[in-house]
Amino acid sequence: MAELTINADDVRNALNEFAASYEPGNAERVEVGRVTTASDGIARVEGLPSVMANELLRFEDGTLGLAQNLDVREIGVIILGDFTGIEEGQEVHRTGEILSVPVGDAFLGRVVDPLGQPIDDLGEIKAEATRALELQAPGVTERKSVHEPMQTGLKAIDAMIPIGRGQRQLIIGDRQTGKTAIAVDTIINQKANWASGDVTKQVRCVYVGVGQKASTIAAVRQTLEDHGALEYTTIVASPASDPAGFKYLAPYAGSAIGQHWMYGGKHVLVIFDDLSKQAEAYRAVSLLLRRPPGREAYPGDVFYLHSRLLERCAKLSDELGAGSMTGLPIVETKANDVSAYIPTNVISITDGQIFLQSDLFNANQRPAVDVGVSVSRVGGAAQVKSMKKVSGTLKLDLAQYRDMQAFAMFASDLDAASRQQLTRGARLMELLKQGQYSPFPVENQVVSIWAGTNGYLDDVPVEDISRFESEFLEHLTHKSSILTTLAQTNVLDDDTAAALKEAIVSFKKGFFGEGDNHLVGAGHEEHAAISGGDVDQEKIVKQKR
């Protein structure tokens, strides 16, 4: 048998050759967790010690989850999708990504879910970028005071509760009082600005439907399309059939889509319809995650849920492009109780509230705005000069009218001044009525309110106020340049006021003299205008019996 000999040089050369040719591979560290329990849209996962808060996780069937509770031994995960295929023992992988949504102009005219995926069967959406859902709100130095008007097209709001671009204005009221109608009318009213092509005037709108019936969201979309407003609107839909996690995330998705445009120097209007259902969804998620409950079983951070969302609405400084995002959150009350937990939270966060009263709605006063409770804390600085001039005493006049109306129920004989308040107040209330999907340009609103507050409608029967208003505005449109002047200057000077006075006096002479259109017909009560000086009881024209 041959003797085995080992040459040290050969060994050295072999090792050198191997070392020279060795190429180390890219070692990958993969964390894999396992599902311990899964039910009701919540999964508990163990084995992922390095996961981040709000990180996306991927289950075996491809469903995504959102890491929420980071406990010592396991993670509480919100399942973003169908959870019926997720079972105990399945693997869960990290993605290393924070939850974000695609954004861009391609989203205009589309309906998407809270993850930014289209659900309107119109094909894929080519996104310009992605934006994290949990994005920090602009800081104090990045903001500018609200000074540009956001016109709703509704006389009761634009005159007494004005909204500015960058403001947060709460719409609050019982169910079926017209909250969504106000939001939709506001979107429709932006059509003229969009058609102008002026970037400084155009407003991109985002409607976030949370917990609504799918048929309701579909009806909103159809309404916007019928009125030509869908082309500048994105709808983020999370109907009642969606899991609680989707309803919780939907407002943040809509806000992220709007913030992309805001930081691009554009103006955005976001409707959150409604935040009370988002709070209920967050309560359900928190209880399933076994977080300790607080008042009304809501978690302790439910205030932060809404504050960090609404604080994103802002008017940015000129250095950041001077864009703005206006928020119109909607909250539903029960039995007009605005002192409940969620309503008081959102009232304290926002810059004002529009309170809708069910009694007014049932009395056919629509929009059913309760002027006494409603307020806009910062919108007054954004109100156009002409509107501020004519509506200065409107709120006080209506408050005095309501007080006098309550007093008149028990008083058999009133002096002339009291009758004057009742006469004018009834006509102002009628003047503030407005049909749905028929927003008014601001110059038309100024003329209507000017006529009412200056007593030019006192001799018009209440039931004919609406017809008088529409025909007078049509008369001005075709036979006068007053509306054009008001639209261009936004100032009601003495010359314009004199021209308006001459026009309405002339119009009333012809209007009262019309044959079939005579304002006082069979069965109508005839009233006479009462000036402030008519204090003698004899000067009051009695009603015809």
Swiss-Prot record:
Record InterPro entries: ATP_synth_asu-like_sf, ATP_synth_asu_C, ATP_synth_asu_C_sf, ATP_synth_F1_a_nt-bd_dom, ATP_synth_F1_asu, ATPase_a/bsu_AS, ATPase_F1/V1/A1_a/bsu_N, ATPase_F1/V1/A1_a/bsu_N_sf
Oligomeric and partner information: F-type ATPases have 2 components, CF(1) - the catalytic core - and CF(0) - the membrane proton channel. CF(1) has five subunits: alpha(3), beta(3), gamma(1), delta(1), epsilon(1). CF(0) has three main subunits: a(1), b(2) and c(9-12). The alpha and beta chains form an alternating ring which encloses part of the gamma chain. CF(1) is attached to CF(0) by a central stalk formed by the gamma and epsilon chains, while a peripheral stalk is formed by the delta and b chains.
Domain of life where this protein originates: Bacteria
Full protein name: ATP synthase subunit alpha
Annotated organism of origin: Paenarthrobacter aurescens (strain TC1)
GO molecular function (one): ATP binding
Matching PROSITE patterns: ATPASE_ALPHA_BETA
Role, per record: Produces ATP from ADP in the presence of a proton gradient across the membrane. The alpha chain is a regulatory subunit.
Subcellular locations according to the entry: Cell membrane
Record's GO cellular component terms: plasma membrane; proton-transporting ATP synthase complex
Annotated site location: Required for activity: S374
Keyword Translocase: yes
Gene that specifies this protein: atpA
